[in-house]
Amino acid sequence: RPARIWLLWVPAIAVTVGVLVAAAIYSHGVAATRGWTLGQRLLSEPRVLFDYLCQLWLPRPLSPGLFNDGYVVSTDWMHPWTTLPAIAGLFGLGLVAWHWRNRQPALSLAIGFYLVGQSIESGPLPLELYFEHRNYLPAALMFWPLALWLTNPDTALPSVRAVTSIGLPLLLAGMTWLGASVWGNASGQAMIWGERNPNSPRAQAYLAQWELNQGRVRAAEARLRTALRSHPTEVQLVANLIDVRCRQGFLDKADLAAAVHSFSTNPDPTRLSFRWLQGALPMAEVHTCGGFGLPEAGQLAHAFADNPSTPVAPGRRSDAMHLLGEVALASGNAHEALADFNAAWASEQRIDTVLVQAAMLASAGLPRLALDHLQLASTPIVRPWYRWRSMTDVHRWVLHRQGFWQQQIDELRGKITSDLVHSP
């Protein structure tokens, strides 16, 4: 019995405590970045689990796909009304597994394994609410009781067992073929997922991108405007709308104002805002899109920086200041660009970002400012092992131990100094 305690209960308790500690750490500020609170997530997940179970026991040839950001959040016990029944049903499944553990061990194991397997990704960690792939491992034992019944010659209903043994694999094979035909067809994915997920901004943006690439510019514009009426703060929708309007040749002030509103109020300022704006800067510099030049790009960058959720989301404040620095540099405001780049470092000490920014300053003909900025990276900040929060911290520690960053800093400093010495 002592061995059982050490081999079973101690690891189980350690894992449980670890998950709860991680949940406490990562749930800080979750409402500002996810759009729901941790309590709302815990209320919603029982409904999600029953949706997963329906996919397993009532399979459909076509799934909602990858775009699940339109899933309705449970705001309390009764909204939606399925919240309380789902919670009660989840407790009921646990009681069934416990009650039948001696008489039906396979059934109890299948239920228990599924619930435990879902307890992390569908539990207190503030992940996205819904993803189909979370069903894979927890469902590994789901159909073991059915297989035992089908292969047991002593059970009743032999004709039903025979028909099920032949018909069920054929049915599942047919639905698998139908599903694979969609997953192997990008245009089919865009159309089907867009139609099946009308409340998903991701699905609508994905379908609009496909329509734009097919030359259906007006259809893409209409789709994005319809989606924006329900989701006015979604950056992916306004960013794609700007792309559509620029394809048409001009961005009017009303659409720019809608974009500024979205960038400044989006509760989940993901890296999408940074990547899209950074990709749009070359277009703004050469002014190939009427109504969208560097001043307009600067408005969006300032809106991103002024968003109240930006300082809360890890890394986004640094991204915002980097964008402002890029806009200032492209506009010829060298010292303003340096101040913004320095502010990005103050927000998050990332040596790779400093190297990129110093290279940008040097490429713009500002080697002295580049050397001044590079000096910030002379004392890299590396978290001690007991403060590691993610693999990113581990990776930074490894690179620091290997002297990688110092080598990169010395190499870039040498190139900039050489250019400065040989410049006229």
Model feature map: region roles:
Residues 1-245, 249-251, 260-269, 291:
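Polytopic membrane enzymes that build or remodel cell-surface glycoconjugates and lipids
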Residues 79, 191-424:
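C-terminal luminal/periplasmic domains and tails of membrane-associated envelope-modifying transferases
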